[in-house]
Amino acid sequence: MTAAAAQIDMSALAHNLQKIKQQAPNSKLLAVVKANGYGHGLLNIAKGAHGVDAFGVARIEEALQLRAGGIVKQVLLLEGFYSAGDLPILVANNIQTAVHCKEQLEALENADLEGPVVVWLKVDSGMHRLGIRPEEYQEYVDRLHACKNVAQPLRYMSHFGCADELDNPTTNEQIETFMSLTDGCQGERSLAASAGLLAWPDSQLDWVRPGIIMYGVSPFSEKTAQDLGYLPTMTLTSHLIAVREVKAGESVGYGAMWTSERDTKIGVIAIGYGDGYPIAAPNGTPVLVNGRKVPVAGRVSMDMLTVDLGPDAEDNVGDEAILWGRDLPAEEVAEHIGTIAYELVTKLTSRVQMQYIP
């Protein structure tokens, strides 16, 4: 019996990708697999993501891992390259790059490369994190068109800051800014990530960039992915390693953060913050044991957490516990903890065993 394990349901991944295609039927899919495939395993997710057209990563190391693993589809560095020394690596491995600043532009202009690089010009349409400002757009376009190290035609992209907030006018403003700048351009364009492709159909351009929704987790606070017809790809599990009787008035765990108000049974589960389960999980955070939700009771330890099974519990050592995923959405757990499901799935540590289910 293993302790903590992340069961990765590859049929759920296939279902989610098919649903994305149905929602953006006229767009190519750039599947975002950064941060170790959102914690699901970079290479296994890439190999199982049948029917996508390209992959997006954040770091050049992630791109090289894809190439070393036999992935031949297009790969894009969403943040672009970090130094001029990266450029020969991009050429040698057929890796595409975003360009969002003058340092990257000048590095491309000054490089002596063996071939051109596919460039996505990243426009700051209103998020103000990365990208060239609208007033700089034409200068960048002209210089990139003139650069021998840049494959033509250029491609164009931007990123939303508030697409998960359906009442926020910023997203429509960003769409208008990006479309007005790039209208008439020869190259392909991309604007929508997960929230965009789900809620803002006008942002479904030549490419969409599904990230979190591909893994069956919602980008929206008010709806789970299952509410939207998507399936959780990850189910995080462990097992009960002890069932103990606790009397009313007795406290459990470090700092005595939880005190029982009744005689009850406590279940000890073999998972903790050393596995990536958040230490911040407060009393009451739900865990699924034998099909019912039971609350976390006491501070999460490095290797264990404790739950209140109830006075009449018939659970036994060895019974499975589900921390999130199947029948317990990660979004629900994240809300209790005061974080987002993105953080839950991406912070699992290496001692969590990855189990891939066809």
Curated annotation (Swiss-Prot):
GO terms for biological process: D-alanine biosynthetic process. Substrate binds at residues 129, 302. It is an enzyme of class 5 (isomerase). Keywords: Isomerase, Pyridoxal phosphate. Its cofactor is pyridoxal 5'-phosphate. Pathway: Amino-acid biosynthesis; D-alanine biosynthesis; D-alanine from L-alanine: step 1/1. GO terms for cellular component: cytosol. It catalyses: L-alanine = D-alanine. CDD domains: PLPDE_III_AR_proteobact. GO terms for molecular function: alanine racemase activity; pyridoxal phosphate binding. The keyword Secreted does not apply. Its EC number is 5.1.1.1. The active site is at residues 34, 254. SUPFAM superfamilies: Alanine racemase C-terminal domain-like, PLP-binding barrel. The modification N6-(pyridoxal phosphate)lysine is found at residue 34. InterPro entries: Ala_racemase (IPR000821), Ala_racemase/Decarboxylase_C (IPR009006), Ala_racemase_C (IPR011079), Ala_racemase_N (IPR001608), Ala_racemase_pyridoxalP-BS (IPR020622), PLP-binding_barrel (IPR029066). It holds the Pfam family Ala_racemase_N. HAMAP family: Ala_racemase. Belongs to the alanine racemase family. Catalyzes the interconversion of L-alanine and D-alanine. May also act on other amino acids. This is Alanine racemase.
